[in-house]
């Protein structure tokens, strides 16, 4: 399995909420080192309001709802990325819509 970090918009998340696969550009970490993974997350966060963390068999595969491991977003404007579980997709969408 490969962990990927996908910069995403509210429209991307709505596709996942509708149980549709998401074909989107993804980033991978330089290694499995925690710092490299964090760096990939931060780079992905520069390009979109939300980062989807997913585990895929192939980095080129579409992201399916069951592949999602977390959502990350700056929920309070502090610059810090908050972590949301896959089951909190509706809450993440609500935050983006405010």
Enumerate the language-model features and the residues they cover.
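Short, extreme N-terminal segment that most often corresponds to the first beta-strand
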Residues: 1-25
């Amino acid at each position: 399995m490969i962990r990927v970090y996908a910069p995403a918009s509210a429209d991307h998340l709505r596709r996942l909420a509708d149980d549709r696969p998401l074909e989107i550009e993804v980033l991978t970490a330089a290694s499995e080192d925690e710092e490299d993974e964090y760096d990939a997350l931060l780079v992905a966060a520069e390009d979109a309001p939300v980062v989807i963390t997913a585990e895929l068999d192939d980095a080129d595969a579409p992201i399916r709802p069951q592949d999602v491991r977390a959502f990350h977003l700056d929920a309070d404007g502090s610059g810090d990325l908050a972590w949301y579980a896959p089951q909190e997709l509706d809450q993440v969408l609500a935050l983006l819509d405010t």
